[in-house]
Amino acid sequence: MAYPHQLGFQDATSPIMEELLSFHDHTLMIVFLISSLVLYLISLMLTTKLTHTSTMDAQEVETVWTILPAIILIMIALPSLRILYMMDEINNPLLTVKTMGHQWYWTYEYTDYEELNFDSYMVPTTDLNPGELRLLEVDNRVVLPMETPIRMLISSEDVLHSWTVPSMGLKTDAIPGRLNQATLTSSRPGLFYGQCSEICGSNHSFMPIVIEMVPLKSFENWTTSMT
């Protein structure tokens, strides 16, 4: 859950997001070390008049500043590729949900259940109850079982949209005529908020996403009440 003046990421609620946070810290450490070294060398050049004449045209120095950046790039690329393939891998999902973007609301269809589909609109500010979040609440939440591999099929019926839930590390484009897929697994119950992340018209900022993760038994009871 996000909070005012937040500088960092939201708490991870999926294995993919946990991997992304680790990769962010890994990359940030490398950037910090490189920046510190560069700033140190610049300050040294500005505060001293020493010149290393023996290294002005040295084959060893040129070799080092060629090989070292290559090693650093490999250290960044390998974990990045690993996460990329993890995000694309979908093995035996137990539930499939089809998401369609519209101007300016979402439609959800649970393909494993007959006639289980609904539209999800933002709750107007005037209709909010105490404690509810402005521009983030919807009339119909996406209820999903926790600790279950779920496949999301995402598309659009009009213009480009983007189905995004930051705490789950999800951001998938909804493109007319194309069906994209994403996988999600939540490690804990709760409400997780997102929004359309592709400018799609005048009401682009009024397309919130609310995922309610519940235990499997509660999900079964919900599907029974909806069908």
From Swiss-Prot:
UniProt subcellular location: Mitochondrion inner membrane
Record: residues binding Mg(2+): E198
Named cofactor requirement(s): Cu cation
Main location: mitochondrion
GO biological process: ATP synthesis coupled electron transport
Keywords associated with the record: Copper, Electron transport, Magnesium, Membrane, Metal-binding, Mitochondrion, Mitochondrion inner membrane, Respiratory chain, Translocase, Transmembrane, Transmembrane helix, Transport
Membrane-side (Mitochondrial intermembrane) residue stretches: 1-14, 88-227
Gene Ontology molecular function terms on file: copper ion binding; cytochrome-c oxidase activity
Known partners and oligomeric status: Component of the cytochrome c oxidase (complex IV, CIV), a multisubunit enzyme composed of 14 subunits. The complex is composed of a catalytic core of 3 subunits MT-CO1, MT-CO2 and MT-CO3, encoded in the mitochondrial DNA, and 11 supernumerary subunits COX4I, COX5A, COX5B, COX6A, COX6B, COX6C, COX7A, COX7B, COX7C, COX8 and NDUFA4, which are encoded in the nuclear genome.
Function: Component of the cytochrome c oxidase, the last enzyme in the mitochondrial electron transport chain which drives oxidative phosphorylation. The respiratory chain contains 3 multisubunit complexes succinate dehydrogenase (complex II, CII), ubiquinol-cytochrome c oxidoreductase (cytochrome b-c1 complex, complex III, CIII) and cytochrome c oxidase (complex IV, CIV), that cooperate to transfer electrons derived from NADH and succinate to molecular oxygen, creating an electrochemical gradient over the inner membrane that drives transmembrane transport and the ATP synthase.
Family of this protein: Belongs to the cytochrome c oxidase subunit 2 family.
Protein name: Cytochrome c oxidase subunit 2
Species name: Georychus capensis (Cape mole rat)
